[in-house]
Amino acid sequence: MLPWQRQVPTSIFPQSNEQVFRMMLAQQHLQLQNFLQQRKMALLAMNPEIPMITDLKKAKFDFTHMADSIESEQKIKEESVSPKMSPTLTTAAVRPFVPYDQPWFMIPGRGRTTGRAARPKKEFICKYCDRHFTKSYNLLIHERTHTDERPYSCDVCGKAFRRQDHLRDHKYIHQKDRPFKCEICGKGFCQSRTLLVHRATHDPNRHSIGAPVVPIKSETPLPELDPRVTLILQNLTDSFNSTSMTSPQISPDR
């Protein structure tokens, strides 16, 4: 006999805590039995072909068709254990849940991420002019323009530089080897940027205003022009000069 099935004698005295606990257990047991009975009836109403679990226990195992018996029992157990919808609800009444109206890649904060937040860029600020730099080395070189610090000095002539690469380029001056040579005149230079500046001197169209143009020395002489062509050019030049000299000028009163 279960504890909650015992008969409690009536008394005029108030019930003890143990008796109250037994009554609560009995009430919960009845509610659980009612719930299981209602669920069993609902399953039978939806699919009457599904046998009850008690019938599964009583059925004998068919050893001749072992694989088929195992699959059928497993299928029946899954269908009986899986939750079913209430028979009062229909599929038309159930609407699909749409959490977002926009695609996932347009929703803020739901795009593709690398798994960690982007690190902010470091800023190195000059203490003299408040200029910002993204690398500490660039800030160090910049501050040397304010302090005029030149830690790299030449061991030949003693000239000092702010950057090590400038000292490296300077050392080419003391060497006979000049790796950057001009293809036109063959002159050698220590630095590539000096060669680029030198190449502009061979191009008359690229020289600056007022700067002397270095003529290009060519081994093959230029061909002589026909005397008739020279005479025509001279006549055109004279006529242009005479026209510009005798052209009427507009009076400012008009």
Swiss-Prot record:
Pfam families: zf-C2H2. GO terms for cellular component: nucleus. The keyword NADP does not apply. Keywords: Developmental protein, DNA-binding, Metal-binding, Nucleus, Repeat, Transcription, Transcription regulation, Zinc, Zinc-finger. A zinc finger (C2H2-type) spans 124-146, 152-174, 180-202. It comes from the Eukaryota. Transmembrane segments: none annotated. May function as transcription regulator. Required for morphogenesis and function of the digestive tract. This is Protein odd-skipped-related 2. It comes from Caenorhabditis elegans. The lineage of its organism: Eukaryota, Metazoa, Ecdysozoa, Nematoda, Chromadorea. The gene is odd-2.
